[in-house]
């Protein structure tokens, strides 16, 4: 039993250290080109919209969303957008991606923790519900979201699965 506790403490410490080196920074005129330059592997391109499209949506929904660059130190390694749906009400996580050259380093997990902390501040409105959709073939992303506590919402289409987390 003590070995399991030590293992958990070690893993938790590693996770927290990793989370601390990852930060979210709003997309601005100073860094939007870095977001445009993020790349996915060819087989991943069908899983998530490119930041160019996402930033166009951010402009339309600018009163209720925040696009972020995901940074490791001073380098943008990914992108994510948080949007508040006043009609439901709920927070939605859109277009989360980690650059193909930066994948497999735990940045997605650390960034998701930062996103959840941001949403926990309720920047746009009061809701304890967080929703997202994920391509059913994106096994790595599905595993990430499920490990964070997201569960199927019951909303599905032929390509995507809806997931929800209540906080």
Describe each PLM feature range.
Residues 109, 136-154:
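Conserved active-site alpha-helix within GNAT-family acetyltransferase domains
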Residues 2-30, 166-167:
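Conserved N-terminal entry element of GNAT/NAT acetyltransferase domains
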Residues 21-95, 99-101, 112, 118-124, ...:
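Acetyl-CoA-dependent GNAT
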Residues 99-105, 136-137:
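Active-site acidic-Proline motif in GNAT/NAT acetyltransferases
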Residues 69, 162-166:
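Short, well-ordered beta-strand micro-motif
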Residues 106, 124, 149:
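Short glycine-rich hinge loops at helix-strand junctions in the catalytic core
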Residues 110, 114, 132:
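Active-site helix adjacent to the Tyr-X3-Lys
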């Amino acid at each position: 039993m003590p070995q399991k506790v030590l293992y958990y403490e070690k893993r938790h410490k590693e996770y927290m250290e990793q989370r601390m080196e990852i930060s979210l920074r709003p997309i601005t005129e100073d860094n939007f080109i870095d977001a445009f330059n993020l790349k996915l592997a060819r087989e991943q391109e069908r899983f998530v919209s490119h930041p160019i499209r996402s930033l166009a949506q951010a402009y339309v929904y600018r009163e209720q969303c925040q696009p972020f660059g995901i940074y490791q130190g001073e380098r943008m390694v990914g992108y994510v957008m948080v949007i508040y749906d006043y009609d439901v009400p709920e927070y939605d996580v859109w277009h989360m991606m980690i650059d193909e050259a930066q994948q497999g380093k735990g940045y997605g997990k650390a960034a998701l923790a930062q996103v959840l902390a941001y949403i926990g501040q309720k920047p746009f409105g009061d809701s304890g519900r967080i929703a997202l959709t994920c391509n059913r073939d994106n096994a790595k992303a599905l595993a990430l979201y499920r490990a964070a506590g997201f569960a199927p919402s019951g909303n599905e289409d032929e390509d995507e699965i809806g997931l929800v987390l209540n906080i």
